[in-house]
Amino acid sequence: MNKVITDLDKALSGLKDGDTILVGGFGLCGIPEYAIDYIYKKGIKDLIVVSNNCGVDDFGLGILLEKKQIKKIIASYVGENKIFESQMLNGEIEVVLTPQGTLAENLRAGGAGIPAYYTPTGVGTLIAQGKESREFNGKEYILERAITGDYGLIKAYKSDTLGNLVFRKTARNFNPLCAMAAKICVAEVEEIVPAGELDPDEIHLPGIYVQHIYKGEKFEKRIEKTTTRSAK
């Protein structure tokens, strides 16, 4: 089955107000730039967003804050966005901060059909408040629940027409997990090759988890913070 699309509307026309979206990427690396821009332009609102972070003021998920399209975000780091800071302090957005490893495991559990699991991470901190806890072998654990979403919006380096994906470097971090835990996955890629061209050992995410593939013409790949040194 050829999963390649040339218009994101074909893949995202069913996305509606109040949906939960799982957005891949780490910082600004490996984010689905085109899907985020689509949501921004369509004005879809009251979204529940699950992502490692929330972009910056004018790029990535940060642009969805401009029109207050995000109702709730589950993330592990949100410190690079002034608009986000303002909305959080004013009670305009619900924020659930989650340890990075726990967030990854919540998504993995969702994709694997595991409803919940116990972890020692967060015991004795604010993270544990309101969560069930149990002791195993003399050590305390808290119950974490799996995360699933209506749409998984991800970015990969290469795909074949069947949706088998190859990621590069840091982009492999949360993108596969967001695909696995979503009902519908839309993958943005830089290159598409015919089915059978990818070596099976090269594939990072099987196409069974991907419903749509969209080839971006030009990804900005912005650097969050650029540090240079003086010429010697």
UniProtKB/Swiss-Prot annotation:
Keyword field contains rRNA processing: no
Cross-referenced PROSITE patterns: COA_TRANSF_1
Known catalytic reactions: a 3-oxo acid + succinyl-CoA = a 3-oxoacyl-CoA + succinate
Pfam families: CoA_trans
NCBIfam families named among the record's database cross-references: pcaI_scoA_fam (TIGR02429)
Quaternary structure annotation from Swiss-Prot or TrEMBL: Heterodimer of a subunit A and a subunit B.
Protein name: Succinyl-CoA:3-ketoacid coenzyme A transferase subunit A
Species assigned in the record: Helicobacter pylori (strain J99 / ATCC 700824) (Campylobacter pylori J99)
Organism phylogeny: Bacteria, Pseudomonadati, Campylobacterota, Epsilonproteobacteria, Campylobacterales
